[in-house]
Amino acid sequence: MGNTSSERAALERHGGHKTPRRDSSGGTKDGDRPKILMDSPEDADLFHSEEIKAPEKEEFLAWQHDLEVNDKAPAQARPTVFRWTGGGKEVYLSGSFNNWSKLPLTRSHNNFVAILDLPEGEHQYKFFVDGQWTHDPSEPIVTSQLGTVNNIIQVKKTDFEVFDALMVDSQKCSDVSELSSSPPGPYHQEPYVCKPEERFRAPPILPPHLLQVILNKDTGISCDPALLPEPNHVMLNHLYALSIKDGVMVLSATHRYKKKYVTTLLYKPI
């Protein structure tokens, strides 16, 4: 009761607002508790913003990691030849590409050979010859910190560009061969033998459409003399010979390249 006058004076100095009381533990009483908008969505974001951002960040990092993994395509395996020329009875190959497990090599005359499909990159290997580990001194080597000497090989894509080009060409040739393949049926290697009566037969009559040779036609006045009329398709890829005149023989052949026709003339003196 004795503090009533002092509280009034303090209240007047603060504009008429009463300061909330605190208990001995430092908290405010329930009746004097300040009003904080805890039910407001802005206050909720204020207290829980860090908790919400953390899982979003983890999800983004995981998504980014998946993209990086997908972008890294596996290296293509390339056939690689390993050869041991130092002799021996039993030769094995071990390397970083097979977890250093022993792989037997195949004897080829005086050498031992193995062909493995290795991914592009750097690989170390070693030979196990008649119970002894050794390396090939004629090939590149690398020495580890412990003093172990291994052979090293670089599998590069550029080393196989020629083989890739040949493979593409072979695929194109195989596609053409499928279109121009022979019909099914029995075949043999025996040459055709002419019968006696066939030797005295007259040659077959020339088909009439082959008589219309371009070189035997007159060029129209309205046409360019340097250009020939479009030939018939049956005249393509045939060799024609004109009558010998003034001691010169003229040979001609017409070929088609897409929509263009090219006629080649060969003049041969007799």
Curated annotation (Swiss-Prot):
SMART domains: AMPKBI. A lipid is attached at residue 2 (N-myristoyl glycine). The modification Phosphothreonine is found at residues 4, 19, 148. One of its GO terms (cellular component) is nucleus. SUPFAM superfamilies: AMPKBI-like (SSF160219), E set domains (SSF81296). Phosphorylated when associated with the catalytic subunit (PRKAA1 or PRKAA2). Phosphorylated by ULK1; leading to negatively regulate AMPK activity and suggesting the existence of a regulatory feedback loop between ULK1 and AMPK. The modification Phosphoserine is found at residues 5-6, 24-25, 40, 96, 101, 108, 182. GO terms for molecular function: protein kinase binding. Residues 68-163 are annotated as: Glycogen-binding domain. Non-catalytic subunit of AMP-activated protein kinase (AMPK), an energy sensor protein kinase that plays a key role in regulating cellular energy metabolism. In response to reduction of intracellular ATP levels, AMPK activates energy-producing pathways and inhibits energy-consuming processes: inhibits protein, carbohydrate and lipid biosynthesis, as well as cell growth and proliferation. AMPK acts via direct phosphorylation of metabolic enzymes, and by longer-term effects via phosphorylation of transcription regulators. Belongs to the 5'-AMP-activated protein kinase beta subunit family. This is 5'-AMP-activated protein kinase subunit beta-1. It comes from Homo sapiens (Human).
